[in-house]
């Protein structure tokens, strides 16, 4: 019996039935009625109750199915009155008694005899009524446990389906009671139940704490034992589904499979080699093998079979190209230069690339080359082709080994450039392009005479268009890292052949030729002037043709013309600049569609022209900037979608789908990507034009940069917005020359927003950008530009960032983990970068508050001290840098904090880690330089330790040089500050003098050569002794030549050295200089003239 009035039931039934009508008009009326009359604050409870009853009890399967789907959709939908579309749900806002009624109906329907498809939909609806933010529902768990014992497999499958969505239903139950449930599911006679059980098991596994994982390990053999039966029975889909679940488990706990790893390798090998299976089964088997390398690389390296198997199966899959097309006729005629339709081949390439990146050449190169040597001599062209593509895929990951074998690799590859089969030629071009990137710039310097002629030979009309295009693309890779001097001898041949490609009747060939010419021009720089007069008129002629069908070609022409202009310089470009600008203005004013590729090319071309013309570009800003402002003001285009729609949306590159609070949210990412591009271009114009851009600053800041920090669904938008802020401020300052009221107001809004972001930003990479923007903004605004409230908020933000970083690093670097390996090098890198930016932001605040910030810093001192006492070098270095900054900018005011860090700092002077020694030495130096009274009792006693640092046998090695030079500068600072108070000062001075030259650390060099100059001026016998003058001169010349000391900074010491040389006979002075080669002597004449 219904809980609703008959009239409500009758009205809503008519609406739901109308939803099933084939008549669009009837459906539209029903949708409107439901939306306007029932999805309201007053009626949503009636509607959800009705839909639950119909899903559970209606004998009309169409009405029941529609009701279940609508119920789930509306349960997830945010209430009409809610402003939190993504977080709020109707199901959590209805009254408890209504929720209880709905739950009762759905559960009764689930347990009754219903069609299998209806029960599936009911299980999805039930799952939405048991989310963790709803009251407990103990009856459900008992019902599911009973259903899992049912003789009807659909009951069992649907029960596991619910547990998949809400695994926490059983996490509170004793694990020993749960194990038999999954054991039974894994051995179920029904394939669908097995799959549902495995999927539910993964969800349950994710919910459990690590301490319980070992208890689940006993189930894994049963899970894996289900796989051979699927294979034997030809159940490809089931096999793929279980592999997908296993992949999730491997990503969580790879070492849980350690004892079964050999069996997994053998079974996946069998599946991948079985070409009778559908591609999804084979590719998911390969993915399972691949994720082991990404999550347990050491386990893979220690297994003899893993590398051999992985290499063998990927090579086999890479031969699966041009099936039933031995001459590759279809491939040759295809205009689509991607090979993604060759699914197994594409998966294999990606897999080998990923595994190589994780395991490296020491492990993978040997098994790979064992097969490659055989394959390149095979009579089967597919094997020769696969060998080339495999080498391309593995090159980056194996670079540690292969970069030393370039001649041998080229001996193997280059003969195949003239292979009879075009796909092998293509593969050869691919290798040459790939290694030109992966082994750059070394390979450009050492092998240009082999690579460039080989690629140029494939640009000729004797080759197929696909090969010509790929050779041209490989030349882009080579040019990107080649100097103009390397390219110059080949330019005639390159340009002659590329101009021929421009005459091709195939659009994609023309487009690639233009891209290659553009990159070569960019690399060749002024060497390209010779070809300017031939190429620029050709490009302009293409741009003048009014044809909307070749917008990409026009875009490539713009790109090419502007890159050539940039290469040859403003003066030469002037000959055609006005003509090109007129064409671009006409295109800008034409009706270009939103999704036309020409729009992006046009925007980038204007940016390059601005780089060429500088301030002469300003008159064009009213034409160029308004469209960018429109794109940059785009809002977040998001929408709630059904789970069934998610796969469709994910097929489109313009959209992304994320899951938040059980909801599927579609994000129109292409709009946001365009927004980022527009913001980056605005940043480019602002950087180039400074004060000339000031007219746009207020609008860009208030309508683009600051609102972008709230774009929580696109990291790039937030990063671009934060980066824009200090650049906009500098434009306004450049225009006015003073800090006017508008500038101060904008800074206050921007800095408050950035500081607030330090607390709320979830991504460490973006937090890093916020700190960087604060530092750059403070540089623009100067002293005391943050209020007391902002300083307090900044301190809280830094504290939160440090706490989060520390916890992340503890999680990754904790004690041995029996389930995972510590492999998060990328995350370490991110955290190191973040800590570096926090160091800079703390320093900026300390510097501009004249020590006033010290009292705020005391609030985060406990966290800094935790870092200081940790064993992780990154954390210790962060703390040491903070200490150095607080002494530099706080000076004698730091006396009260002295005892909190000095014992650890002096201990760090003898650390085995050179980076820590460097930071500690720097601190001792700033103690003497900025707070000599407070730290005299620290600095003088450390002199002997500092001398040991600069004097030990490996002190001048590359890895130790920075720490040595900082210790050297610290000695100089102590000698300068405490000269008369130091016993044996001349001995220490002599020891210091032996540390010169200082050629790596610019800050250390600056002080060391100031001190050297002072010693000379004071006629110190240590440096002024005739026997030492040659060493003095040499140390100064080396510092200037290595640019650790700029010519401007070096004027004082150069002047002192000249004075010192004046004491020598001119012949002796010239003898000192004459030992230098001609290139250095040319500089010496300039420095010492």
UniProtKB/Swiss-Prot annotation:
HEAT repeat ranges, renumbered to this chain: 6-39, 44-78, 96-129, 138-165, 175-207, 216-252, 260-295, 304-359, 361-395, 399-439, 441-481, 484-524, 526-568, 571-613, 615-689, 692-735, 742-781, 788-849, 852-890, 898-930, 938-978, 986-1017, 1028-1063, 1066-1089
GO BP: mRNA export from nucleus; protein import into nucleus; regulation of mitotic nuclear division; regulation of protein desumoylation
Residue ranges that the Swiss-Prot or TrEMBL entry lists as coiled coil: none
InterPro entries assigned: ARM-like, ARM-type_fold, Importin_beta, Importin_rep_4, Importin_rep_5, Importin_rep_6
Pfam families cross-referenced by the UniProt entry: HEAT_EZ, Importin_rep_4, Importin_rep_5, Importin_rep_6
Location of the protein in the cell: Cytoplasm; Nucleus
Family, similarity comment: Belongs to the importin beta family. Importin beta-3 subfamily.
Subunit structure: Interacts with Ran (GSP1); interacts specifically with the GTP-bound form of Ran (GTP-Ran), protecting it from GTP hydrolysis and nucleotide exchange. Interacts with RPL25; this interaction is dissociated by binding to Ran-GTP. Interacts with YAP1; this interaction is dissociated by binding to Ran-GTP. Interacts with NOP1; via its rg-NLS. Interacts with SOF1; via its cNLS. Interacts with histones H3 and H4; via their NLS. Interacts with ABF1.
Name under which the protein is recorded: Importin subunit beta-3
